[in-house]
Amino acid sequence: MGISIDGKKYRRINMKNATYSSNEQGCYRWNDEDTYHYFRYDKIKWRVLEVNGNTAFLLADKVLDAQKYNNKIESITWSSSTIRSWLNGYDSMENSQKKDYTKVNFKNEAFSNEEAAAIEKKEVTDNTDQTESKNDTKDQIFLLSKEETSNNKAKNYGFLSNGSGYDNARKCKSSTYAKAMGTLSNFMLHDHGNCLWWLRTPGINSYYASDIDYYGYSGGGVPIEARFVGVRPALKMDLSNTDLWSYAGTISCNNTNNENKKYDLEQMQLVDTNNKQVSESSDEYIRIIYLALAKFVYNKDIDKNIGKSIHDIMISNDTIYYDYK
């Protein structure tokens, strides 16, 4: 359920709304079943896999939700799965469970009408070695295939061609909302916070769907009714309307973001090492904020000739902490 508070839109859910909940390590902590938790709608960051003319092939930078691949245990492929209908907002004729997703779906929640109009329909292969049927589809939103993440084609998108290889580019964390919905995160120190995410290709048989695990491996898959696997949508977008998108930086081969960081100066607090907040009306406040932004955002040296020399500047959650030499 989406609501607005002080002009900002939030998604409100409680534990009963989650796809999966548990007290085991790696799960979101709910205090009870009924208390609502609020999650702010933010712009989705997309990883660019390929650009062809004005069309960009995009993959969500994080897992955005937790959903079953299919709502019932049965032999299934992408074309008749419930996750395909949920992603695109299809009616009951498009999935084996005859469930209508025209009102509650990912596309309506994630995109405005103008944004949705810029998403192109892609021919999506229903490729499988596990079933005799093959029903390719044309969808705006889809899941990546095993071929796109772990074969020769995968190299074009920045992934290892070896599905059993330890691949930083395939590893993924989730949004906080996705974790609340049920994604199970790795709680070990190494690769902490990574989660599983669905591929559309069947796994060891048609009762399983392939996935990417905590460490970037693509194996035999997970049962299609699993509730703790994350959804990482992919799409092809027309880039000609530049008002609909903005550059968000780059990502390195070790999955480290090099973002264009933005800070709202009106929201920044300034706190010295004695935890004393500096008045926003003072010259000191403006000076130190800009010195901190110069150091952390633009990677510039602090100008030591401006008044006292400052060191140990740190930005955390819209607060700047600092100390003098």
What are these regions, as identified by a protein language model?
Residues 1-297, 307, 313-322:
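Collagenous Gly-X-Y triple-helix signature in extracellular proteins
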